[in-house]
Structures are given as C-alpha cells and as structure tokens.
Design a protein with these regions (language model features):
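Gly/Pro-rich turn-and-neighbor structural signature
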Residues: 75-83, 152-155, 160-163, 190-313
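The substrate-binding groove and active-site-proximal loops of carbohydrate-active enzymes
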Residues: 43-46, 104-123, 138-148, 183-202, ...
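An acidic-aromatic substrate-binding cleft motif
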Residues: 66-119, 124-144, 312-315
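Hydrophobic faces of well-ordered beta-strands that scaffold small-molecule active sites
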Residues: 99-103, 134, 140-143, 168-171, ...
Length: 317
C-alpha cells in the first residue's frame, strides 16, 4: 500500500522484512511514524494480500477469537485490557506453499446442513469456509463435488474465493478446472467420457474450464480418470495419459497465452494412477506430484530423497 511505501521511504520499516517474501506478515508498533500520524501506532503489514490477511487474523487469534468461533461456536475470550509488546512479531514464511482441505464425502451431513441453512453449496456458505481457512493460515480448497458443481451452481463461488485470497482447485478426477457434475448434467451434449473415442468434445470441455478460470489464482488438476471417479480401465496405456496431459497443457498455453509452466498444475497419483507412475509414466517437470493415501490413512508413497530433483514439487493428499 502507499502507506507502507511511505514508511519504507521514511526508514520507519526495514525493507527486507517483507520484500520478496511469500505470505509473510509482521505485527509491530511504531512511534510517530509519519507527519500527521502522531503517537503510538499498531502496524500490521503483509508481503502480499494473504500475508496481510494472516496478520489481521493472527492479532484476532491472540486477542482471543478462535478460528472456529463460527463453525464450532467457540466462545470469544473476554479481555479487560489488551496490551501490545514492543518489537516485531511474525510467523515468517509458510514452509508449505499450498495448504488446504478437500470437502469430500459431504453427504448427508454437510450437504443436508448447507442445503437447509443456505440453499446449497453456494457463496453464502463458502464465505465461512474461506474465512476459516484464512484464520487457520491455509490458502487452498478443493470444493465439495459429490452432487455440486462449484463453478456452475453459484457464479459467485469462484470470484469470491479469488477476492478473499483462497486458491481453488478441483479434485483428483476433475481435470482442467471443471467439476464432474458439469459433465454429468450435460452428458448428452458432450458424449461419453472416453478420450480415445470422444477427444474433440472432451477437449472442448477442458478448454471451457481454463477459459473460465483465466486471470484467477487457481491450481489446475490435470490428467484424467474414468467416468465418475472410476479407473479408466485395466488395459489403460500410460502413453494415453501422457498424451492427454500434453493436449491439456497445450490448451492451458493457448488460453492463457503463456507457457503452460506459468500456470500451477498438479497430477494426483490416486489409486491406480500411482501404478502407472511406477511403470514409468512421465510427468512434466513443472507439475506438482500429489501423492495419496489408500483411503484408509496409509500413505502409499513418499518422495524418493535419492531421486532426481522434481522442480514442480510434491504434495500429500
């Protein structure tokens, strides 16, 4: 902000505290920082939007507001007085770039509740999810997808997330910023979910997703599984998946008008996809490899510390 720039120019704030940092905040006190701003000042500053948000919510937490005040009815702690220590408080930069949750297996509990209270998985409900994530210093969300279509059911779901600083992705079997329900509801238009026999329509479905998310901060899930979160088939050739990813990245590049590597992507090695990877399936260097458990909490694979460095990094689902 212009205010922070004035403080930096006046030497009231050290430039290297926030410069070139990711999602970092500082909370500090200043005395007579600028002309016209006399007395003691409490300053919350961030290296970027989320850094600033985390700083505000960290102060809220230390005052006595739990991140779960809304979702779990945690009482707000009463304080007779609030004191601020001199010096600089910070959590530093996050060690993990993308930190978030997947709203999965949401029916009947959450689905029934949000339908009764908000009319569905819409922005009236998601605003509370976004706030919770930010208060927990998270930044990433895979939205509910059993019967919901995050992008289509409420056109405000995605823009609100982007405005608040939440990065949206789609689940392991929903590639190219599309929800499975979007395909299921228009199956007569798009045809069978089979890339070998219906490439043109599926590519169109993919392209529409990237066009819709263009300009927003999202992580694009790539590759493909079978229809409705099922395996593609026992005889699936890894070369088919590699070709699908090649075509998807071409679409990403065409729509965004920049190299595909400039758009964050992940490939989820869920279930049988890990077996393809073990057989030598090639993953582009810039794509995040999302390792997964076996649905029972048993981690199937960890990054090999002796393997060649993978620039795209790794995640755990």
């Amino acid at each position: 902000s212009s205010f922070i720039r004035q403080l930096l120019k006046a030497g009231k704030l050290e430039n290297d505290l926030l410069k070139d940092k990711n999602e970092k905040f500082i909370i500090t006190t200043l005395h007579n920082p600028l002309k016209g701003l006399e007395g003691d000042v409490l300053l919350i500053a961030g290296s970027d939007k989320r850094g600033t948000i985390y700083g505000v919510y960290e102060l809220s937490r230390q005052i006595g507001v739990s991140p779960w005040y809304w979702w779990a009815d945690v009482p707000v702690t009463h304080q007779d007085a609030i004191y601020i220590k001199d010096g600089i408080y910070t959590d530093g930069e996050p060690a993990i770039q993308y930190r978030g949750i997947f709203i999965n297996d949401e029916w009947p509990c959450m689905g029934g509740w949000t339908t009764e209270k908000f009319g569905g998985f819409n922005s009236k409900m998601y605003v509370h999810v976004y706030e919770l994530l930010l208060r927990l210093k998270a930044n990433f969300l895979w939205p509910a997808m059993w019967s919901a279509a995050f992008y289509a059911d409420d056109p405000m779901n995605s823009p609100l997330a982007d405005e608040m600083g939440i990065i949206i992705g789609t689940s392991h079997h929903e590639p190219m910023a599309r929800n499975h329900q979007e395909y299921a509801r228009r199956r007569q238009e798009y045809g069978p979910w089979n890339y070998q026999t219906n490439k043109e329509n599926i590519d169109r479905f993919f392209r529409e997703g990237i066009e819709r998310m263009k300009g927003k901060e999202e992580v694009v899930t790539i590759a493909m599984r079978g229809d409705g979160d099922a395996p593609m088939g026992p005889d699936t050739d890894t070369r088919l998946l590699e070709n699908i990813v090649k075509e998807q990245r071409k679409i990403i590049s065409d729509v965004t008008e920049k190299p595909a590597s400039k758009t964050p992507q992940l490939w989820a090695l869920y279930s049988e996809v890990l077996e393809y990877y073990d057989k030598g399936m090639k993953i582009p260097d810039d794509v995040m490899i999302l390792l997964c458990d076996d649905n029972w909490g048993n981690v199937r694979r960890l990054p090999d510390l002796n393997a060649k460095h993978h620039p795209g990094g790794y995640g755990m689902y």
